[in-house]
C-alpha cells in the first residue's frame, strides 16, 4: 500500500514520455504526494500503441495486437475489461492507457507537444530544458521515452535497388499487392507483418538468421502462457523447460526444420503468432536462412540460394536513442544501458529509467508496475541504494547471466528474464529498507 509522502519535503519529479511506463511512474509518484510534470512529445497518451502517433516515433501498424494475454499484461490494480479479447489490439490498448490516465488523474499533469532538449545535473537537482526555450529544475527525472523510436538497418540496405522499408514504417498490407516481398527477421513485428501481407502479395519470404521456436498462441483452448505457467516450476532447469516447449510446439506445428527454420538450443526471445504457421501450410509464406549479400534486387542467402524481390521489409530492431542525455549516460553501442536493475544509473543520483527492457515471457506493462513502485520508494526516501561499486557488481552479475543464457546479438541487449529480475529486485528492496539514510 502506498502511503502519502512527507509533505514537509515536497519532491518534484519530471517524467519523460506518456506511454505505459511513464503513466505508471506518474501514477505511483502522484499517489505519494510528489509533484509530477510529465513531458510528452505527441498530443496523446499511449506511446507505441498510438497508431500514426504525431510524435513521429510510433511503430504501430493496423493489425498490431498484444502478444501477451491481457490479464497478465495489465497493471496490477487496473485490469482490462473482463469481457474484452484475450489479446487486445492497439486501439483497445490505447483506450486502456487513456482510461488509466483518467482514473488516476494523470492527464492534468501532462504537457503535450513538449520535446525535451536536454537533461543535466544542476546544483544538486536536474535541469530539464525544452525545445524552443525554457527550463525547469526537478529533484529527479524518470526517463520513460521508450526504446523503439530509432530503427536499425542491415549493412546491405543501400545495395538493394527495390523498395526498402523498416518495419517501423509499415502500416497496412495493401501497397504490397502482387509484389515479391522479403521480410527480414523473426521478431514479433516481422512475423506480424509477414502474416499480414501474405494474403495480398505474389510471394512472401521470411529470412531467419537465428534459430527460432514459433510457439502456438493457444493450447488446449487457452493461451499457451497459462499452460506453461502450470507445467513449468521455478526449480526446473532451462534445458528441461526448453524440451517441454519443443514438445508442445511440435504437437501443434511440427519440427521447426520442417518449415525451414532451426530449433534453438539456447534461450531466445519467445515468438508466437496465431496464424503464421497456417500461412506456411498454405504456401503463402516460405522461409530462408540469413542473408550473405544483396545485389540489385537479388538477395543471396547462407544456404547458397538466391531470389529476387520487389520489396524488403526489415524487422531488424531498434537502437535506444536518448539525445537529451549527456553522451556518458546514453546506451552503449546504441543498445545496452548501463543501469542497476534496469532503473538506476550508478553514478547519477536522481536519474531513473522505466520500461527500458524486453520481457522474455509475460507482459512488459506488469513489470513496469514493479519498477515504478521502486522508483517512487527511492524518490520518497523509503529505500536507500547501495554504493556505486556494489551496484556495478550486481550489474555485472546480471550481464553474466544474460551472456550465459541468451544470444549475444543486439536484439538481446535489453532482454529481461522476469523470474531472475524479480528475485533480484525483491532482494534489493528488502536491503534498501534496512540501509541507513545519508
Q: PLM features: what roles do these ranges have?
A:
Residues 65-68:
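Flexible "cap/lid" subdomain of the alpha/beta-hydrolase fold that forms the substrate-access gate
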Residues 389-393:
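Charge-dense, low-complexity polyampholytic segments
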Residues 395-403:
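Long alpha-helical segments found as membrane-embedded helices
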Amino acid at each position: 500500500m502506498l502511503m502519502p509522502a512527507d509533505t514537509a519535503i515536497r519532491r518534484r519529479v519530471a517524467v519523460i514520455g506518456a506511454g505505459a511506463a511513464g503513466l505508471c511512474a506518474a501514477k505511483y509518484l502522484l499517489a505519494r504526494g510528489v509533484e509530477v510534470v510529465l513531458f510528452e512529445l505527441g498530443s496523446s497518451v499511449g506511446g507505441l500503441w498510438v497508431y500514426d502517433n504525431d510524435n513521429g516515433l510510433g511503430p504501430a501498424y493496423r493489425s498490431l495486437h498484444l502478444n501477451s494475454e491481457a490479464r497478465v499484461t495489465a497493471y496490477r490494480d487496473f485490469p482490462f475489461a473482463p469481457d474484452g479479447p484475450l489479446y487486445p489490439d492497439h486501439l483497445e490498448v490505447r483506450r486502456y492507457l487513456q482510461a488509466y490516465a483518467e482514473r488516476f488523474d494523470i492527464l492534468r499533469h501532462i504537457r503535450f507537444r513538449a520535446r525535451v532538449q536536454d537533461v543535466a545535473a544542476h546544483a544538486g537537482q536536474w535541469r530539464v530544458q525544452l525545445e524552443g526555450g525554457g527550463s525547469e529544475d526537478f529533484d529527479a527525472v524518470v526517463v520513460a521515452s521508450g526504446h523503439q523510436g530509432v530503427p536499425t538497418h542491415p549493412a546491405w540496405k543501400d545495395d538493394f535497388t527495390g523498395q526498402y522499408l523498416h518495419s517501423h514504417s509499415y502500416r497496412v498490407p495493401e501497397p504490397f499487392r502482387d509484389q515479391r516481398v522479403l521480410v527480414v527477421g523473426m521478431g514479433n513485428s516481422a512475423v506480424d507483418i509477414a502474416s499480414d501481407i501474405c494474403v495480398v502479395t505474389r510471394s512472401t519470404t521470411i529470412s531467419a538468421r537465428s534459430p527460432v521456436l514459433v510457439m502456438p498462441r493457444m493450447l488446449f483452448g487457452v493461451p499457451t502462457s497459462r499452460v506453461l505457467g502450470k507445467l513449468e516450476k521455478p526449480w526446473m532447469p532451462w534445458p528441461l523447460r526448453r524440451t517441454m516447449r519443443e514438445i508442445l510446439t511440435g504437437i501443434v506445428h511440427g519440427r521447426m526444420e520442417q518449415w525451414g527454420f532451426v530449433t534453438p538450443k539456447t534461450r531466445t526471445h519467445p515468438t508466437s503468432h496465431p496464424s503464421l504457421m497456417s500461412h506456411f501450410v498454405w504456401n503463402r509464406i516460405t522461409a530462408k536462412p540469413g542473408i550473405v549479400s544483396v545485389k540489385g534486387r537479388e538477395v543471396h542467402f547462407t544456404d547458397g540460394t538466391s531470389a529476387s524481390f520487389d520489396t524488403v521489409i526489415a524487422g531488424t530492431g531498434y537502437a535506444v536513442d536518448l539525445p537529451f542525455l549527456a553522451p556518458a549516460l546514453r546506451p552503449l553501442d546504441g543498445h545496452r544501458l548501463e543501469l542497476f536493475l534496469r532503473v538506476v544509473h550508478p553514478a547519477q543520483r536522481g536519474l531513473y529509467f522505466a520500461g527500458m527492457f524486453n520481457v522474455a515471457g509475460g507482459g512488459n506493462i506488469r513489470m513496469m508496475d514493479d519498477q515504478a513502485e521502486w522508483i517512487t520508494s527511492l524518490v520518497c526516501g523509503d529505500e536507500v541504494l547501495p554504493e556505486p561499486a556494489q551496484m556495478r557488481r550486481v550489474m555485472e552479475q546480471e550481464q553474466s547471466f544474460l551472456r550465459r543464457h541468451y544470444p549475444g546479438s543486439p536484439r538481446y541487449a535489453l532482454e529481461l528474464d522476469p523470474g531472475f529480475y524479480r528475485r533480484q529486485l525483491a532482494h534489493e528492496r528488502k536491503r534498501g529498507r534496512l540501509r541507513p539514510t545519508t
